[in-house]
Amino acid sequence: MEEKNKIYLTQETIKKYEEEKWHLINVERPAVILEIKEARQQGDLSENAEYDAAREKQGQIEDRITELENILSNAISIQESHSDKIGLGSVVRILNQSTGKERTFKIVGSFDTDPTQNKISYESPLAKSIIGFSKGDVVEIDAPDKYTTKILSVNDK
């Protein structure tokens, strides 16, 4: 698998996508096939809005199944990190030395990013700047407004 195609996901997200794919294949797909069959029985397909709507829905379902298959075939599961060094899966507590504000977050893959849950992408400027560092290190964050941050803890260590 090429590095650029890898998609880092938590085990929970992998499970969620697998369940969605199963539902689309085993529930949604058969239902839309039935809708198409029923719409065909109404006669002239050239002016059949139900048929057109069902075919469009079928296309959306098939597109989503293909998308999920692509995601899952390229998925790399992010394990909880227990390392002293920051990496994917690490829970990090930092101190912004300019503002004096502390912040705690988990570094995750792009598909798992959720600022409301304090989950940031490993591709974000903050994560890119601190990956590989350890507790006690002071790091310059390469963001639009550069600032320095002190790493207070990594995985509660």
Curated annotation (Swiss-Prot):
Keywords: Coiled coil, DNA-binding, Transcription, Transcription regulation
Disulfide bonds: none
PROSITE patterns: GREAB_2
Coiled-coil region: 47-75
InterPro entries hit by this protein: GreA/GreB_C_sf, TF_GreA/GreB_CS, Tscrpt_elong_fac_GreA, Tscrpt_elong_fac_GreA/B, Tscrpt_elong_fac_GreA/B_C, Tscrpt_elong_fac_GreA/B_fam, Tscrpt_elong_fac_GreA/B_N, Tscrpt_elong_fac_GreA/B_N_sf
GO MF, any single term: DNA binding
Signal peptide (UniProt feature, chain positions): none
Alphabetical GO biological process terms: DNA-templated transcription elongation; regulation of DNA-templated transcription elongation
Gene3D superfamilies: Transcription elongation factor, GreA/GreB, C-terminal domain, Transcription elongation factor, GreA/GreB, N-terminal domain
Function: Necessary for efficient RNA polymerase transcription elongation past template-encoded arresting sites. The arresting sites in DNA have the property of trapping a certain fraction of elongating RNA polymerases that pass through, resulting in locked ternary complexes. Cleavage of the nascent transcript by cleavage factors such as GreA or GreB allows the resumption of elongation from the new 3'terminus. GreA releases sequences of 2 to 3 nucleotides.
Family to which this protein belongs: Belongs to the GreA/GreB family.
HAMAP family membership: GreA_GreB
Protein name from the UniProt record: Transcription elongation factor GreA
Species per Swiss-Prot/TrEMBL record: Mycoplasmopsis pulmonis (strain UAB CTIP) (Mycoplasma pulmonis)
